Amino acid sequence: MSRQPILDIKGLRTVFRTRAREIVAVNDVDIVVNPGETVALVGESGSGKSVTSLSIMRLLARKVGFIDAGSIILRGKSGQTVDLAAIDEEAMRRIRGNDIGMVFQEPMTSLNPVYTIGDQIGEPLRVHRGTSRREALEAVVELLDRVGIPDARRRAGQYPHELSGGMRQRATIAMALICNPTLLIADEPTTALDVTIQAQILDLMQKLQSESGMGMLFVTHNLGVVAEIAQRVVVMYAGRIVESGPVKEVFRNPRHPYTMGLLRSMPRLGDATEMKRRGEKLNTIPGMVPGLANLPSGCAFAPRCSFAVEACHAAVPPLASVNEHHGSRCIRWQEIAA
């Protein structure tokens, strides 16, 4: 399998225009996804994860959000590369749903309630390949069976409200994969599901990835999911990458205070019961993610950081190399090993 990246983002900067000013939502972001690899994009709400994924898909609100700088190089099924940040909407339409598939967080809002499941999943085949409705239906039934939906032919004729939450999410995964994309973007695909169904969906996505060799960008705030599904992790805060590297290394040896805080905030099996018995509280990161319109000077995390010194407020730190594969945007990364 070629190790040339499927996705290579460099210097991505995404801006939203308001009446008063322009707000930078994603700033100087670099991400690489290789064939067969899952890269997790993590952070609290408001960190810029979803805006990054919407920038890749070019689904930003028109006239409000736009890519201001950087490149998004995609290697499609043909093996040719294209800069998604530079092409027009007509060219992007040929890529969206064909070379790139996307699974959204809430299937009930990403599925159209007035069309059958079969019609919606089959639409990319009809649009991108000119497949007949009958041929598309057969492909849909086969894929629904692969993603674990029983009685697939009958389900293809049903509407979204007739399926359970887990089945709807399986259907959206099928819709994203129907054209065999080289890249799958999954934006919080298990958040709205219970723990049992979540585990099934994660297993399914890993199985389908191993069969196809596609790359996956997995957007989540759940570090437990990251440990299970991803090989590399990119941690975002206030629109910037603050740490990135192999999952095992970053989790065992985080070198940014924000990553350390996220890991310490993870509840572990038995923690809640034992802490309640002792009258203790779960660990949290003090403060809130700052609004992008009013970012603090210097390091955006400094007001919440117990390691902050005066220099942290003076300038935005560069993304320093901990080693060849691990980076941290902290001037004190050498001092804060967990």
UniProtKB/Swiss-Prot annotation:
So where does this one cross the membrane?
A: none
Subcellular location(s): the record lists: Cell inner membrane
Matches recorded under SMART domains = AAA (SM00382)
InterPro entries recorded for this chain?
AAA+_ATPase (IPR003593), ABC_Ni/Peptide_Import (IPR050388), ABC_transporter-like_ATP-bd (IPR003439), ABC_transporter-like_CS (IPR017871), Oligopep_ABC_C (IPR013563), P-loop_NTPase (IPR027417)
Q: What keywords tag this UniProt record? A: ATP-binding, Cell inner membrane, Cell membrane, Membrane, Nucleotide-binding, Peptide transport, Protein transport, Translocase, Transport
Occurrences of domain ABC transporter (ranges): 10-263
EC assignment: the record states 7.4.2.-
List cellular component terms (GO): plasma membrane
Question: Which GO molecular-function terms appear in the entry?
Answer: ATP binding; ATP hydrolysis activity
Give the main EC class: translocase
Sequence positions that bind ATP: G43, E44, S45, G46, S47, G48, K49, S50
What does the record list as coiled-coil region(s)?
Answer: none
Return the Pfam families for the record: ABC_tran (PF00005), oligo_HPY (PF08352)
Q: How does it sit in the membrane?
A: Peripheral membrane protein
Assembly and partners?
A: The complex is composed of two ATP-binding proteins (BOV_A0347 and BOV_A0348), two transmembrane proteins (BOV_A0350 and BOV_A0351) and a solute-binding protein (BOV_A0352).
Family according to the record: Belongs to the ABC transporter superfamily.
| Listed PANTHER family | ATPASE AAA-TYPE CORE DOMAIN-CONTAINING PROTEIN, OLIGOPEPTIDE TRANSPORT ATP-BINDING PROTEIN APPD
Q: What does this protein do?
A: Probably part of an ABC transporter complex that could be involved in peptide import. Probably responsible for energy coupling to the transport system.
The protein here is known as: Putative peptide import ATP-binding protein BOV_A0348
Q: Give the organism, scientific name.
A: Brucella ovis (strain ATCC 25840 / 63/290 / NCTC 10512)
